[in-house]
Amino acid sequence: MQAKTHILFSLICVLFYIDYYNVQNPIIFTILVLFTTLAVDIDESNSKLGKHFKPFSSIIQWILGHRGLLHSLLIPLLFYIILSFLNQQEIAIAIALGYISHIVMDILTPQGVYIFYPFKLKINGPIKVGSWLEKLLAILLLIAIAVKLLFVL
């Protein structure tokens, strides 16, 4: 998925989350979720964030490959456990939400994701990156965000 689609899906996830749970600082929570959803693609040197950290992202891509370890559920689980242990529950949830929302969207593509990496169980879907179907999904997510915001305000 493209960065904008990841951001839109993460944003709707944030809106639903803060609607049901008390978030101390919703602005920082949202920023952290959105940053994390883009940071997952640091293993792709041509991603939105990867371009800004080119030497680092190229090394990560060379070592781990794209949609390998960094696209598994192991990483958000580790972040969640460590941050929860450090009594940073809200940060842990924000990172997990951003990370998992990214993985969910990448599952919808034919390239799919090995969510239980290193086990080779790939889960994938029909939406090609940049296709009309992804554009339609982005429009639907934008509409969902607008509708959700109407009910919040």
Language-model features: where?
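N-terminal membrane-targeting hydrophobic helices
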Residues: M1-L153
